[in-house]
Design a protein with these regions (language model features):
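Residue-level signal for short, function-critical loop segments
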Residues: 57, 71-72, 161, 211-213
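Bacterial Sec-dependent N-terminal signal peptides
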Residues: 1-14
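The feature captures the conserved acid-bearing segment of alpha/beta-hydrolase catalytic domains
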Residues: 181-239
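Serine-hydrolase catalytic machinery in alpha/beta-hydrolase-like enzymes
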Residues: 25-31, 36-42, 47-52, 57, ...
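Primarily recognizes the serine-hydrolase "nucleophile elbow" in alpha/beta-hydrolase
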Residues: 129-201
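Short N-terminal segments immediately surrounding and downstream of signal-peptide cleavage
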Residues: 12-26
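C-terminal catalytic histidine-bearing segment of alpha/beta-hydrolase fold enzymes
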Residues: 231-274
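Structural recognition of the beta-strand scaffold that forms the well-ordered cores
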Residues: 65-69, 97-101, 154-158, 182-186, ...
Length: 274
């Protein structure tokens, strides 16, 4: 499938990734709606996956790259505080960022009971498409490493909430051409991810969550850490008490505000930054 490129009003490159919507019933275009705990709009009804490119300026470039997967329950994409704001912060650390708009549950199906057994059946089904978008994003960045001036062996993926589920599922299902070299699930929503073994190549993992998380994601986050640690894979878990779900890059005035700098220090410590 042909990959399309275009630029937004700020001159940032936006790439349309390969996709096949067989089995999905989209009606109408993408929709912008007021987001969860934010005054900025989130996107819904995303049927065409894209990545938006954020590159560090000049000599800042460390040749490290990160795919960023915003959250939103597979029904929305919180692209500002869990996407663009993250990308800009990564750029300041010399890391190239690629913000992913993965495919979401069709908007006309949100809130409808389809008589399926799993309480999150629509979201779980959508993960099968969303994780493919993440894998295609990694593959695209790796194939274009020279263009983006990055090291093809220093490509990470991070995601928030449902984006954390996309991050984990993509890692579990990855192959040599599209596997991440490291990953950072941030309060990952593991209820829609089946239990799986860490991949044999053992990518380093950095996990963040809080015990105050509205959706009780601390224990599943700890389980991910245990899975990695039991195999002696590089793994780090930052589990804070204070901090509600969905903080992203917003300040909470609690210790969890240090998560981003801690993550960058960890990326450096595992040899993926310099």
């Amino acid at each position: 499938m042909v990959i399309f490129y275009y630029f937004n009003s700020l001159g940032q490159e936006i790439i349309t990734l390969p996709y096949d919507n067989t089995g999905l019933d989209y009606q109408g275009p993408e929709v912008e709606k007021k987001g969860y705990l934010t005054d900025k709009n989130n996107f819904q009804n995303i049927s065409i996956p894209t990545i938006q490119v954020f590159l560090p300026r000049g000599n800042l470039n460390t040749k490290t790259a990160m795919i960023v997967c915003p959250g939103g329950g597979m029904r929305a994409n919180a692209i500002h505080h869990e996407g663009f704001d993250v990308a800009k912060a990564l750029n300041k650390k010399g890391i190239s960022a690629f913000v992913l708009k993965y495919r979401l549950v069709p908007i006309h199906l949100i809130g409808k009971n389809e008589g399926l057994d799993h309480p999150y059946s629509k979201e779980k089904k959508q993960l099968a498409y969303g994780h493919l978008d993440a894998l295609n994003a990694i593959a695209h960045v790796r194939e274009n490493a020279l263009k983006y001036e990055i090291n093809p062996d220093k490509i990470g993926i991070m995601g928030f909430s449902a984006g954390g589920a996309v991050t984990m599922e993509a890692t579990y299902k990855s192959s040599e051409k599209n596997r991440p070299n490291f990953l950072a699930p941030i309060y990952p929503w593991m209820k829609i991810v089946d239990d799986q073994e860490p991949p044999a190549y053992g990518p380093p993992i950095f996990i963040v969550c809080t015990t105050e998380d509205t959706f009780k994601l601390a224990i599943p986050s700890a389980r991910i850490y245990t899975d990695w640690a039991e195999k002696n894979y590089i793994s780090e878990l930052h589990l804070y008490h204070h901090g509600k779900h969905g903080f992203g890059m917003r300040k909470t005035n609690y210790p969890v505000d240090n998560w981003f700098d801690n993550m960058v220090d960890w990326i450096d410590a595992i040899g993926m930054l310099n």
